[in-house]
Amino acid sequence: MDAALLLNVEGVKKTILHGGTGELPNFITGSRVIFHFRTMKCDEERTVIDDSRQVDQPMHIIIGNMFKLEVWEILLTSMRVHEVAEFWCDTIHTGVYPILSRSLRQMAQGKDPTEWHVHTCGLANMFAYHTLGYEDLDELQKEPQPLIFVIELLQVDAPSDYQRETWNLSNHEKMKVVPVLHGEGNRLFKLGRYEEASSKYQEAIICLRNLQTKEKPWEVQWLKLEKMINTLTLNYCQCLLKKEEYYEVLEHTSDILRHHPGIVKAYYVRARAHAEVWNEAEAKADLQKVLELEPSMQKAVRRELRLLENRMAEKQEEERLRCRNMLSQGATQPPAEPPAQPPTAPPAELSTGPPADPPAEPPTAPPAELSTGPPAEPPAELPLSPGHSLQH
């Protein structure tokens, strides 16, 4: 089948190269569309810009998810499964293609850890770059032009037919999934599966951060999301404590307290992290702050102070033993032996011929004076500072 068709869209022309099968799919919001594509210029050579088959990885987009190149959703929803079609698109539809292409190329080269899909995250920031890092894309960005897209529709999945990633969810769906992820994280934490629990908390935080970008900072809805984010972040930090990643805990809790200095749990969690890395003064200061803000936590604070005292005593004893061992090793080390003397050359054989004129003797350097003092001892090593030791 080879027919030229005009879609009911300005600046788009469709030519079917190979007919599809079945009826037109039901492209509802949330449907996943999987396809191969080839992008070409409209010059005589039909210069290829991108081809998904070259990386052996189909493209996929989610219908209704604000894809970067909006015209592609229009093109795909006009196709049947296994159909191959060529679309000519005018400049009004192709202006952002260089930005999309840059993302796709970087992903194909392994520079992006996600799969080969693209959605509208940080699109506006992309315009701040003076160069896209590819000469052909820089040229397209400077002088937008019509492009040809050859698309083969491979598969259409309903929203219920695949596991949707959180970035694919609508705002309403993200708000609904956050408490589910939160509860699952708590369940996994109680089972001691801290790595899995931390992943659930992280996923929920990402959902909330995405929603928060759409609100005006410090207004009611933004603050509501911020409170939820802080709660999940502190749960995440408790997973990190279990995994002995103390410095990351210090980073997250300090960031929370910079913006919200009244959160008691943040001081408490940070105090525990300080104690684990022998920051005694900082741990005590945070525990004191906990008591000031929440006197009812006196019992828990006393317990942490006892643990801190025991930890510091163990550390001091460990360092005392280390220093004593170094001193004893230095005292028992034998003095260095003097260097061996070089072997003397054998006497020259007597000649029976007429005596030759003796060669001129080179001037000899004076011998080095021997030191009469005792051998030097190696310098003693400095003990590790308790505040910077990495031992746990």
Curated annotation (Swiss-Prot):
Compartments annotated for it: namely:
Cytoplasm; Nucleus
GO MF assignments: peptidyl-prolyl cis-trans isomerase activity
**SMART domains listed in its UniProt record:** TPR (SM00028)
Annotated region (Disordered), positions in chain: 329-392
Give the Pfam families listed for this entry: PPIase_AIP (PF23322)
Q: List each copy of the PPIase FKBP-type domain by range.
A: 53-145
- Which keywords has UniProt assigned to this entry? Cytoplasm, Nucleus, Repeat, TPR repeat
Chain intervals with Pro residues compositional bias = 335-346, 355-366
Enumerate the TPR repeat regions by residue range: 178-211, 230-263, 264-297
Q: Name one GO cellular component term.
A: cytoplasm
The UniProt function text for this chain reads: May be important in protein trafficking and/or protein folding and stabilization.
How does it associate, per the subunit comment?
Interacts with NUB1.
> What name does the UniProt record give this protein?
Aryl-hydrocarbon-interacting protein-like 1
Species name:
Macaca mulatta
